[in-house]
């Protein structure tokens, strides 16, 4: 069948007075032009998004790191995606992923006891359960949904501390994230200090691995994403910057030097999910962070991924 088709092509070329060689040259040239056009379109789109992200930095007097992955098309949107930022409380979603990776679902029913001395600043859930303790699953949920800092420290302890967390990320391909301290010291975010830092690209890649990749089986992925969908601290962040009919599961973070972050898995209707990491910082230690910056950045992403 293939030989007959080649014969027909040869006859057609002969009739038109074109050699097979010239036909190949013509089609090859057309393909090259098409490839150049597509490359140019992508480059133009990247330049446009870079300009918009740069304008947001000027508007809010902040440094911005962005990485988004359309898991259906593998298209990415990025800006300062390889620059380091303090990850702040965004680690809690990924640490919960590590916890699920290293333990059976039954382990989530284990009751963990802790004392008043274990409590650190901003522990709205754990502070109510000093006398009774909490199930490990409840602690993980408190860390992700309420950003409870004592719960975050307990997660760290259950996975081998900050360095255990870092090691677990290395095993899924992250060669960037540095994890060194517990809550609340990890939120210092001193410029130039690489402790407790990562990049938007590394964090987004980790979140993708735990929520849609192979780092967790489907049943555990569902547990993690349900915790993230119930996040009580992200309404003014990525969730505010995407269409209202998109489902968002996120984990926010905040620290000194105007650090404000949000990472999310976002489900547009009838489309594969999008993974988004948005990190930000400012120059002054006591600078106030801007939720609106984290809300406006995803508007650029949504427009670019259409």
Curated annotation (Swiss-Prot):
Residues at the active site: 89, 185
Catalytic activity: a beta-lactam + H2O = a substituted beta-amino acid
Pfam families attached to this UniProt entry: Beta-lactamase2 (PF13354)
Cross-referenced SUPFAM superfamilies: beta-lactamase/transpeptidase-like
Top EC class, one word: hydrolase
UniProt keyword annotations, A-Z: Antibiotic resistance, Hydrolase, Signal
Binding annotation for substrate: 251-253
GO biological process: beta-lactam antibiotic catabolic process; response to antibiotic
MF annotations from Gene Ontology: beta-lactamase activity
Residues making up the signal peptide according to the UniProt record: 1-43
InterPro entries: Beta-lactam/transpept-like, Beta-lactam_cat, Beta-lactam_class-A, Beta-lactam_class-A_AS
Assigned EC number: 3.5.2.6
Family from the record: Belongs to the class-A beta-lactamase family.
Function: This protein is a beta-lactamase with a substrate specificity for penicillins.
Misc. remarks from the entry: The class A beta-lactamase family has a specific amino-acid numbering system, sometimes called Ambler or ABL numbering and often misspelt as Amber. A multiple sequence alignment was used to derive a consensus sequence and then the consensus was numbered taking into account insertions and deletions. This allows use of identical numbers, e.g. for active site residues, despite differences in protein length. UniProt always uses natural numbering of residues, hence there appear to be differences in numbering between this entry and some papers.
Protein name: Beta-lactamase 1
Organism: Bacillus mycoides
Gene: blaCI
């Amino acid at each position: 069948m293939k030989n007959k088709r080649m014969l027909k092509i040869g006859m057609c070329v002969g009739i038109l007075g074109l050699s097979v060689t010239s036909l190949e040259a013509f089609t090859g040239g057309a393909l090259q032009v098409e490839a150049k056009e597509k490359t140019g379109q992508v480059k133009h789109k990247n330049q446009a998004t870079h300009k918009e992200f740069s304008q947001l930095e000027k508007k809010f007097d902040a440094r911005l790191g962005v990485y988004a992955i359309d898991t259906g098309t593998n298209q990415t949107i990025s800006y300062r995606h390889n620059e380091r930022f303090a990850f702040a409380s965004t680690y809690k979603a990924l640490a919960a992923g590590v916890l699920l990776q290293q333990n059976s679902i039954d382990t989530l029913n284990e009751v963990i006891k802790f004392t008043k001395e274990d409590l650190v600043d901003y522990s709205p859930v754990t502070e109510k359960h000093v006398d009774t303790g909490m199930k490990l699953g409840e602690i993980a949920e408190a860390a992700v949904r309420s950003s409870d800092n004592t719960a975050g420290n307990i997660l760290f302890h259950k996975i081998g501390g900050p360095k255990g967390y870092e090691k677990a990320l290395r095993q899924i391909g992250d060669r960037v994230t540095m994890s060194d301290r517990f809550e609340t010291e990890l939120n210092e975010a001193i410029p130039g200090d690489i402790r407790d830092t990562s990049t938007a690209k590394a964090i987004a890649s980790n979140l993708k691995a735990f929520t849609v990749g192979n780092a967790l089986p489907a049943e555990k992925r569902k547990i993690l994403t349900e915790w993230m969908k119930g996040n009580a601290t992200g309404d003014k962040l990525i969730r505010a910057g995407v269409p209202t009919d998109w489902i968002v599961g996120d984990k926010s973070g905040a620290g000194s030097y105007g650090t404000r972050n949000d990472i999310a898995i976002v489900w547009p209707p009838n489309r594969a999910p999008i993974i988004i990491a948005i990190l930000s910082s400012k120059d002054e230690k006591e600078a106030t962070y801007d939720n609106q910056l984290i809300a406006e950045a995803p508007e650029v992403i949504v427009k670019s991924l259409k």
